[in-house]
């Protein structure tokens, strides 16, 4: 289903035993080989030894590393310097200060999340001022609030997982529906910008 609808990214949770979606580095290498070349593979890590994301980025298995632990600036810069590949750093947003901390990150992209994971509840979007740097939005985003999330915060990308599942497994029907919906929203947003320019 993923290859059929071609989302921009496909995320793989790597060596995170606490996640039910956990995969080994070897499993990811196999899955990525079957991924359409237009889809960028992203490895999701939580406080991994830096050698793990570095090796998968260097061998071409991954386009980017998405970090969800307590990785500091030194860790982020080490991955960037040793691979030349993008780093996405996730931040739990509970206060305006959390947003400012995220904006100061040396990561190539920041990911704004509600932080507790899997609750299906978004964080308070009013905490996010207009953001100039490209960011990913995650946490509690699904069919019912996707349009509002994009029109309110204008993220560069949205990170979806639980909302694409049925009984804990990725649902091909939901994946198709949400990608179609995202493409419609993006077309509408582009149309609005064109009209604003013409006025």
Show where each model-derived region lies.
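Conserved N-terminal beta1-alpha1 strand-loop-helix module at the mouth
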Residues: 1-199
């Amino acid at each position: 289903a993923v290859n059929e609808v071609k989302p921009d990214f496909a995320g793989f949770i790597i060596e995170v035993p606490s996640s039910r979606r956990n995969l080994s580095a070897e499993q990811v290498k196999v899955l990525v080989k079957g991924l359409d070349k237009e889809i960028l593979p992203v490895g999701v890590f939580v406080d991994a030894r830096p050698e793990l994301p570095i090796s998968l980025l260097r061998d071409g298995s991954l386009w980017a590393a998405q970090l969800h632990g307590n990785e500091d600036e030194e860790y982020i810069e080490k991955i960037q310097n040793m691979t030349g590949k993008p780093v996405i750093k996730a931040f739990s947003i509970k206060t305006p200060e959390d947003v400012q901390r995220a904006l100061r990150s040396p990561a190539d992209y920041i990911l704004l999340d509600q932080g507790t994971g899997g609750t299906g509840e978004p964080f308070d979007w009013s905490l996010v001022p207009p953001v100039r740097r490209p960011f990913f939005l995650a946490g509690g985003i699904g069919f019912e609030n996707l349009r509002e999330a994009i029109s309110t915060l204008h993220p560069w990308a949205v990170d979806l997982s639980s909302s694409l599942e049925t009984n804990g497994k990725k649902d091909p029907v939901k994946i198709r529906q949400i990608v179609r919906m995202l493409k419609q929203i993006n077309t509408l947003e582009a149309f609005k910008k064109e009209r604003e320019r013409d006025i």
